Amino acid sequence: MTGVYERRVASIRASEFQSMMHHPSQDSPTLPESTATDSGYYSPGAAAGHPHHGYCSPTSATYGKALNAYQYQYHGMNGAAANYSGKAYSDYGYGSPYHPHHQYSGAYNRVQPPSTQPEKEVSEPEVRMVNGKPKKIRKPRTIYSSFQLAALQRRFQKTQYLALPERAELAASLGLTQTQVKIWFQNKRSKIKKIMKNGELPPEHSPSSSDPMACNSPQSPVVWEPQGSSRSLSHHPHVHSHPQPSSSSPASSYLENSGVWYPTGTHLQNLQNHASLQHPLALASGTLY
């Protein structure tokens, strides 16, 4: 009996190196360490009642400190060491009778660990089905107030392209975003190009759109001229053709003024005769005094 035991011990030592080559250490994060109960269960004394099955020797007790505590070797009656892996049993849903801890390892290996990196959430625009076809939902159009439209129109007449500081300043003054101002200018430029391509006059060049106080009525004459003056010049050109007398008498000044308002020839002749009569009377009165 002692010789048989020594022969088996020698075979165990020889098979340790083989088990290290074929069975690397497997650490199970969910199972506890081997206890004295496990060693007692797999001790040669516990297996003595079933000699036809052989016995299992723990490799972590005396000989196999380098091996894992959960690895065991099965030795048959002929002393040859046979390595049994619990994976063959775990694939069928039950554990090995000699390796009960492998019933957990098979299920643990089949469970995929959760991914450590969170998936990036890609925000896609809402899509709805229209007549069986997917269609993206457009954003609502921006409604501009009359004050905002007037300010944008005035700025567009000055320049059709805005720099970044100008666009930011205009958007802040009107309470809009820079994107809204940029889109408004883009739409306005495309509209102007389309109108000019069709050969139509842009509304910006009309006086009513550029200046709200402008009037399209014809201009009134600047200088008001009496109708009698034009008539007197056309019918009586001889009034201005004759040289005026050099004397600044009241009669001569009266004749000049009356020529415009009284164009009739009879009245003009009477005035001239009256002036000629007053001139010799003035000379005679001077001699008397």
Swiss-Prot record:
Gene3D superfamilies reported in the protein's UniProt record: Homeodomain-like (1.10.10.60)
Cellular localization per UniProt: Nucleus
Residue stretches in coiled coil: none
InterPro entries assigned to the protein according to its UniProt record, in alphabetical order: Distal-less_Homeobox_TF (IPR050460), Distal-less_N (IPR022135), HD (IPR001356), HD_metazoa (IPR020479), Homeobox_CS (IPR017970), Homeodomain-like_sf (IPR009057), HTH_motif (IPR000047)
Biased composition (Polar residues): 26-40, 206-220
Superkingdom classification of source: Eukaryota
The keyword Nucleus appears for this protein: yes
Recorded GO MF terms: DNA-binding transcription factor activity, RNA polymerase II-specific; RNA polymerase II cis-regulatory region sequence-specific DNA binding
Keyword hit for DNA-binding: yes
Stored PROSITE patterns: HOMEOBOX_1, HOMEOBOX_2
Annotated protein name in UniProt: Homeobox protein DLL-3
Organism of origin: Xenopus laevis
